[in-house]
Curated annotation (Swiss-Prot):
Alphabetized InterPro entries for the sequence: Cystatin_dom, Cystatin_Fetuin_A, Cystatin_sf, Kininogen_Fetuin_HRG
Cited PANTHER family: ALPHA-2-HS-GLYCOPROTEIN, FETUIN
Tissue: Expressed by the liver.
Gene Ontology CC annotation, any one: extracellular matrix
Residues the UniProt record annotates as site (Cleavage): 139-140
Lineage, uppermost ranks: Eukaryota, Metazoa, Chordata, Craniata, Vertebrata
A Pfam family assignment: Cystatin
Position of the signal peptide: 1-19
Protein name in UniProt: Antihemorrhagic factor cHLP-B
Subunit structure of this chain's protein: Homodimer.
Disulfides per UniProt: 28-333, 85-96, 110-128, 142-145, 204-216, 229-252
Amino acid sequence: MNSLVALVLLGQMIGSTLSHHLQSHVDCNGEDAEKWADMAVHYINEHNLHGYKQVFNVINEIHVLPRRPRGKIIILELKLLETECHVLDPTPVENCTVRPPHYHAVEGDCDVKILHDEGVDKVIGAKCHSDPDSVEDVRRNCPKCPILLPLSDPHVVDSVEYVLNKHNEKLSGHVYEVLEISRGQHKYEPEAFYVEFAIVEVNCTAQEAHDDHHHCHPNTAGENHIGFCRATVFRSHASLEKPKDEQFESDCVIFDVKEGHAHSHLIEHHIGNYNTSPGHNNTVLNLAHSHNHTSASHESHSHEHVAEVPVAVAKREVPTNTPHDHTHPVKLCPGKVHHFKL
């Protein structure tokens, strides 16, 4: 019994010590908070292997922990939103359009660790979990708006292949293959399937590209041509076969990947596999929002090892003692909504 009491007291002492060192009262709308959030999103976009570039929407919480022998660890809890720029798009994220709610927006919850040492801040890790807005909410606000489909849906895959074949037929001496399917939606009135996908130029002829026994490869480093396509393929309600002569609208933009481009390594990551982005409702760094419930788990951490208090204890606790003054404390978090709330 005495041992049990001693263990309880020891736990209370440790908890009290951690609570004392944990600084939770950081203004989520302050200049430092905004600077840290921008740094975190830049890090996430640089390490994103799939899907779309992100912007931060809300700073949910900030925790500051001591780090031995010096410095501190800053833990940000962020909500991000998907833009319309694919990760391979060289457009600066500041110039990318945030995907609006009526296009079935996707939100990410991210925990980001930042090391602050001798006046220098450095992101040392990030973990993100993404979810699309619910179908019910989309339909409640816009009954006829397009709804996200699993990227493995046959209509999505067939539409991508159909549009890419049509695109290759128009080109002379250039053949492209799919790098990644990143979005698929079902449209209504008229019935159609909307798709977005990344492509890369390969060293095959058109005939070789249709040969299942021939393996195409991207052009040599420094000569890669990558692009991104948005397309709508119109289908009848009863049509379940692969599209043949359906009407379609497409817009494919081709980028030149310069040697040393930050994302040139992604081509080798993708090519050789028929890729869809990883699924949502999983812990993923890349926030790729494939909406296909596939299993994916990616975390990013620098190789630097830091001594820190475990993240699991970095949660704000409800005080056990009620303060005697009757003034209402200023609510510092969450911060303001920068775009819209899902």
